[in-house]
Regions:
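Bacterial N-terminal signal peptides
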Residues: 9-16
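Acidic, polar-rich low-complexity tracts and alpha-helical solenoid repeat scaffolds
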Residues: 2-4, 16-157
Length: 157
């Protein structure tokens, strides 16, 4: 029983070290398609910091290509999931400005405003962030009045 537990521990540590090694290889790689696939997998595995770091490189390189839209959206979502709402809002705003009819436009508008809402300060502090959240959420409601996220946006406002 004890050997079995030691075996499991060694196996888990090996897997952890291999995944760290892969991340380092990806960061040094010049193959941006490989980086993009790794970033998507990291995002799916909830490794948002790794995904965001890799996607920052990909967004610049993929600008004007068919992967540009998805990489920019995933960069915004990685920052959002990592609770970096100001950065995510900036990426989402860039997304819906570049791709107003893109396949992630609705989510980008929503998460931009909702992220600013989540980042809003206490009432006794400067409310410029709150005003920005209200403006973004209202724009979301104006653009997507039939969205399934309408009630969430209305409650936040």
């Amino acid at each position: 029983m004890r050997n079995y537990r030691n075996y499991i521990t060694v196996l888990l540590l090996s897997a952890l070290l291999c995944s760290c090694g892969e991340y380092q290889r990806v960061q040094k790689s010049d193959d941006y398609n490989y980086k993009f696939e790794f970033a998507k997998r990291a995002y799916e595995e909830k490794k948002y910091v790794q995904a965001a770091t890799i996607l920052k490189d990909c967004v610049t390189v993929f600008k004007g290509s068919e992967k540009a839209e998805e990489s920019l959206y995933l960069l915004g979502m990685s920052n959002y999931e990592n609770k970096d709402y100001l950065s995510s809002g900036s990426y989402f705003k860039t997304y819906y400005t570049r791709y107003p009819k893109g396949k992630f436009a609705e989510d980008a508008r929503f998460y931009c405003g909702y992220g600013y809402y989540l980042d809003s300060p206490d009432p006794q502090l400067d409310q410029s962030g709150t005003i920005q959240a209200i403006e973004e959420l209202q724009a979301f409601l104006d653009y997507f009045p039939r969205s399934d996220k309408v009630s969430i946006a209305q409650n936040a406002i």
